[in-house]
Amino acid sequence: MALSGQDWRRHQSHRQHRNHRTQGNHQKLISTATLTLFVLFLSSWIAYAAGKATVPAPLVEGETESATSQDFNSSSAFLGAIASASSTGSGSGSGSGSGSGSGSGSYGLASMNSSPIAIVSYQGITSSNLGDSNTTLVPLSDTPLLLEEFAAGEFVLPPLTSIFVSIVLLIVILGTVVGNVLVCIAVCMVRKLRRPCNYLLVSLALSDLCVALLVMPMALLYEVLEKWNFGPLLCDIWVSFDVLCCTASILNLCAISVDRYLAITKPLEYGVKRTPRRMMLCVGIVWLAAACISLPPLLILGNEHEDEEGQPICTVCQNFAYQIYATLGSFYIPLSVMLFVYYQIFRAARRIVLEEKRAQTHLQQALNGTGSPSAPQAPPLGHTELASSGNGQRHSSVGNTSLTYSTCGGLSSGGGALAGHGSGGGVSGSTGLLGSPHHKKLRFQLAKEKKASTTLGIIMSAFTVCWLPFFILALIRPFETMHVPASLSSLFLWLGYANSLLNPIIYATLNRDFRKPFQEILYFRCSSLNTMMRENYYQDQYGEPPSQRVMLGDERHGARESFL
């Protein structure tokens, strides 16, 4: 039984509301999963940093014992051991040992009433016997390797913690690969997504994919081995790819923000200029700028291959001038541009929403008899003119207001962006009713614009939280005014890498134009992907699928023929 046009539109309205609730639940689920992974990642690194906390070096000959005792009391590792066992001790000699014990030579004295525990002093190792309070003196040369490393001021990461951190980092790497590969496959397979406005999104996905494949695996090995065993040549190549890919990812984010800003503030002018050739040129400029930042250490300055003790390391060039140049070009300038651009986009979106609410209020008053369509405060009712620029945007002129509906996936979680120009012109459909299809579509676009404002906050928050700590540390390190623990440096570095995992989630998964292809690709239902996307787009525009619309048109055509 075929539904009438009015019944079908009512049915589609209920269906759209149900779909919106389902999409909201999906977004909450994705956000919760992302937050959980982020918290898991952060907690693992906190445990990793706590485990790698080093203890002060052993007492060297000629060092004052008071300084040794002061350094020892500042060590959190030994304070925890001392707090867990009540120790009292006494000894002879000229030196005082750790805690309340004292010792001399290469031995330390301690007395404990709890379970057997070994405490490393700066002059030796003390160990208590089980069941009595006698103290056994153990020379440092006779202690196990782990205790020797404790005495030497080093710490071996517990195996379980190391395995846990490695698993979390592997999950980050695999998630980054899967997410960005899905973006590339979706754009290649779906004709609707092969538009110039998505070229930068593909470039972003490729840069993040390179981070996951070329940078993260070596960084994981470096973390596990805790030293660089692959030679200076491979170190230079790895560092160059690291700087190149991470900088390209950040600059792609900046270019996307500028692209969206121009599409909203200058829709008519920029819509014509946004051609495939120019977007490819923009992508080339992004990668060229990233190369200009990554190549100087490889070709001219050189990277760091040894630390002060001669141990092999692999660190980017710490030249002060280069660090200023690299941090400004890779982060601080793009961050400033993105903050300005997204603030302007947020203001434009808010202004549009307020103008459309005001226009709808005037129109409602006119229809209820409290106002008049020809009154000065209400714009005249008119018809809607639509024009397509051929690159993914539809321009609509209604009264005194010019609107642009961008069908390119970007900031809006619904897959579109709405821009307005004018001093508050009115909005009306050809029927002059608030329940007309034009007003339903307009309300739908305004709802998407509100979601876009929320997405802006997510974008800036994720980008800033992930990369700001690392680049603050990058500016501090060349001054050598403070010692930065290696675990803290690793945490900030991997936090920046995690941004490559969040990018496909924020820029693609929250966008309906990408979310549906992702689902179909993951379920291996790619044969009818373009047909399904075309039907969804048709339904969003007209409120009914093509088959039903054709059927209703045939019914009206048959009724007209019978009347004639």
From Swiss-Prot:
PANTHER family: ADRENERGIC RECEPTOR-RELATED G-PROTEIN COUPLED RECEPTOR, IP13425P-RELATED. Disulfide bonds join 235-314. Keywords: Cell membrane, Disulfide bond, G-protein coupled receptor, Membrane, Receptor, Repeat, Transducer, Transmembrane, Transmembrane helix. G-protein coupled receptor for 5-hydroxytryptamine (serotonin). Also functions as a receptor for various alkaloids. Ligand binding causes a conformation change that triggers signaling via guanine nucleotide-binding proteins (G proteins) and modulates the activity of down-stream effectors, such as adenylate cyclase. Signaling activates adenylate cyclase activity. Residues 386-396 have a biased composition (Polar residues). A motif (DRY motif) lies at residues 259-261. The keyword Repeat applies. SUPFAM superfamilies: Family A G protein-coupled receptor-like. The chain crosses the membrane at residues 29-51, 165-188, 199-222, 237-258, 279-302, 331-353, 455-476, 488-510. InterPro entries: Dopamine_rcpt, GPCR_Rhodpsn, GPCR_Rhodpsn_7TM. Residues 11-23 have a biased composition (Basic residues). Residues 223-236, 303-330, 477-487 are extracellular. One of its GO terms (biological process) is male courtship behavior, veined wing vibration. This is 5-hydroxytryptamine receptor 1. One of its GO terms (molecular function) is neurotransmitter receptor activity. GO terms for cellular component: dendrite; membrane; plasma membrane; synapse. Sequence repeats lie at residues 89-90, 91-92, 93-94, 95-96, 97-98, 99-100, 101-102, 103-104, 105-106. A motif (NPxxY motif) lies at residues 503-507. Residues 238-247 are annotated as: Agonist binding. It comes from the Eukaryota. Residues 1-26, 367-396 are annotated as: Disordered. Ergotamine binds at residues 242, 247. It comes from Drosophila melanogaster.
